[in-house]
Amino acid sequence: MARYLGPKLKLSRREGTDLFLKSGVRAIDSKCKLETAPGQHGARKPRLSEYGTQLREKQKVRRIYGVLEKQFRNYYKDAARTKGNTGENLLQLLETRLDNVVYRMGFGATRAESRQLVSHKSIMVNGRVVNIPSFKVSANDVVSIREKSRTQARIKAALEVAAQREKPTWVEVDNAKMEGAFKRVPERSDLSAEINEQLIVELYSK
């Protein structure tokens, strides 16, 4: 399955919520009708079945983190094999992706931009260049911008935007040094309450 390259707002309208796919401090502009699906007949919101509701939640989370279907299913399998709550394990695995950590630290304005920074070898983990977006970041790892990439306008712009919003408690960032520490894996209570991971567990358990 190819990665979606079309309008980002269309995906947010499809899921009926802001997926934070666009950069900026504020949420999506009020002109974007999130309660209405895209397309000519978007106003006619169909009544979803139980399966449809579960599928929409899975698609929403997959799009938030920018993960393809096969990758997402593999994350679920790993989460199911891990001791503890499968849904919480799934979200924690997604949160430890390097592209997501780069986004959480404010080095990229969006997860898509953060993924690009990783792929283009602009990111280092513990002093070594890592260009794999799905690389798993561990507690106490130090993530930094590579020296030769620190003058990039988009990184500076992202840091300015990030400075205006509250940083997650599980990362510690030094904007001057352009580096941050991943202090711990976030708990479920740290993450968005708008995600219902249990629906995803129910979907994949069938």
UniProtKB/Swiss-Prot annotation:
<dbReference type="InterPro" id="IPR022801">
    <property type="entry name" value="Ribosomal_uS4"/>
</dbReference>
<comment type="subunit">
    <text>Part of the 30S ribosomal subunit. Contacts protein S5. The interaction surface between S4 and S5 is involved in control of translational fidelity.</text>
</comment>
<dbReference type="InterPro" id="IPR002942">
    <property type="entry name" value="S4_RNA-bd"/>
</dbReference>
<dbReference type="InterPro" id="IPR036986">
    <property type="entry name" value="S4_RNA-bd_sf"/>
</dbReference>
<dbReference type="GO" id="GO:0006412">
    <property type="term" value="P:translation"/>
</dbReference>
<keyword id="KW-0689">Ribosomal protein</keyword>
<comment type="similarity">
    <text>Belongs to the universal ribosomal protein uS4 family.</text>
</comment>
<protein>
    <recommendedName>
        <fullName>Small ribosomal subunit protein uS4</fullName>
    </recommendedName>
</protein>
<dbReference type="InterPro" id="IPR001912">
    <property type="entry name" value="Ribosomal_uS4_N"/>
</dbReference>
<comment type="function">
    <text>With S5 and S12 plays an important role in translational accuracy.</text>
</comment>
<dbReference type="InterPro" id="IPR018079">
    <property type="entry name" value="Ribosomal_uS4_CS"/>
</dbReference>
<keyword id="KW-0694">RNA-binding</keyword>
<dbReference type="GO" id="GO:0019843">
    <property type="term" value="F:rRNA binding"/>
</dbReference>
<feature type="domain" description="S4 RNA-binding">
    <location>
        <begin position="96"/>
        <end position="156"/>
    </location>
</feature>
<dbReference type="GO" id="GO:0042274">
    <property type="term" value="P:ribosomal small subunit biogenesis"/>
</dbReference>
<dbReference type="GO" id="GO:0003735">
    <property type="term" value="F:structural constituent of ribosome"/>
</dbReference>
<keyword id="KW-0699">rRNA-binding</keyword>
<dbReference type="Pfam" id="PF00163">
    <property type="entry name" value="Ribosomal_S4"/>
</dbReference>
<comment type="function">
    <text>One of the primary rRNA binding proteins, it binds directly to 16S rRNA where it nucleates assembly of the body of the 30S subunit.</text>
</comment>
<dbReference type="Pfam" id="PF01479">
    <property type="entry name" value="S4"/>
</dbReference>
<keyword id="KW-0687">Ribonucleoprotein</keyword>
<dbReference type="InterPro" id="IPR005709">
    <property type="entry name" value="Ribosomal_uS4_bac-type"/>
</dbReference>
<dbReference type="GO" id="GO:0015935">
    <property type="term" value="C:small ribosomal subunit"/>
</dbReference>
